[in-house]
């Protein structure tokens, strides 16, 4: 039976491989001990007030989809202790890096999920997020794989449902085709407004941006990034 309140799930995953290098024993232990304490339980209904998900008192809740090695998410959750953060990363080695960082510097305002981000989006209450970040997602270069790109009409509908009016959807990529793809999809979606006024609005990194390992590699290889910000109407 289809839930009429939420968009249908795509037939395929939006992410590629889930595992890379074998985990070290300490990393495996973190998956067994730390991740269960931080992982969202989607088997239970989401609280209407998401602030109750966190150990620390928070004022708003943001989400980062596909946080990679967790550089930005760990940085932001430390920089804004008054905000709650939900981080989603299905790639096991990326999650391992994040868990290692949290083992050294815990974040009581952070929860994690290691599977499909659309499951979290469909679990969240309406108008419950103050922002969604999607940085350097898999571009799925081949045309036949474009349907796997996370930016899609269905997922923008999901974003529109869970974002509060005035909340931001931020997208960064070093792949020009995916940047243009995202601009086209968001500008034709009734729920999102792109307010850029000059090239600096997409050429300059976000305020306080810490950079990521992937981004550094892209720059080293001669690629430039675009940093887009869309406002939920």
Curated annotation (Swiss-Prot):
SUPFAM superfamilies: S-adenosyl-L-methionine-dependent methyltransferases. The active site is at residue 138. It comes from the Bacteria. Pathway: tRNA modification; N(7)-methylguanine-tRNA biosynthesis. InterPro entries: SAM-dependent_MTases_sf, tRNA_(Gua-N-7)_MeTrfase_Trmb, tRNA_methyltr_TrmB_bact. It holds the Pfam family Methyltransf_4. Catalyzes the formation of N(7)-methylguanine at position 46 (m7G46) in tRNA. Belongs to the class I-like SAM-binding methyltransferase superfamily. TrmB family. This is tRNA (guanine-N(7)-)-methyltransferase. It comes from Brucella abortus (strain 2308).
């Amino acid at each position: 039976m289809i839930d009429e309140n939420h968009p249908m799930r795509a037939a395929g995953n939006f992410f590629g491989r889930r595992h890379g290098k074998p985990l070290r024993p300490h990393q495996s232990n973190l998956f067994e001990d730390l991740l269960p304490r931080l992982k969202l339980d989607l088997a239970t209904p989401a609280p209407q007030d998401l602030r109750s998900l966190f150990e620390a008192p928070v004022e708003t809740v943001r989400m980062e989809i596909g946080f990679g090695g967790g550089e930005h998410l760990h940085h932001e959750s430390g920089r804004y202790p008054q905000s709650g953060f939900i981080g989603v990363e299905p790639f096991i080695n990326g999650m391992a890096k994040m868990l290692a960082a949290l083992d050294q510097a815990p974040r009581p305002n952070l929860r994690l999920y290691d599977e499909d981000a659309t499951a979290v989006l469909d679990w969240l209450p309406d108008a419950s997020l103050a922002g969604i970040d999607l940085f350097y997602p898999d571009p799925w270069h081949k045309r036949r794989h474009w349907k796997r790109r996370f930016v899609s009409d269905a997922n923008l509908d999901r974003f529109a449902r869970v974002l509060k009016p005035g909340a931001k959807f931020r997208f960064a990529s070093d792949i020009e085709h995916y940047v243009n793809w995202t601009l086209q999809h968001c500008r034709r979606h009734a729920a999102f407004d792109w307010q850029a006024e000059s090239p600096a609005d997409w050429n300059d990194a976000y305020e306080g941006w810490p950079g990521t390992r992937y981004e550094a590699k892209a720059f080293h290889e001669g690629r430039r990034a675009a940093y887009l910000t869309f406002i939920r109407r």
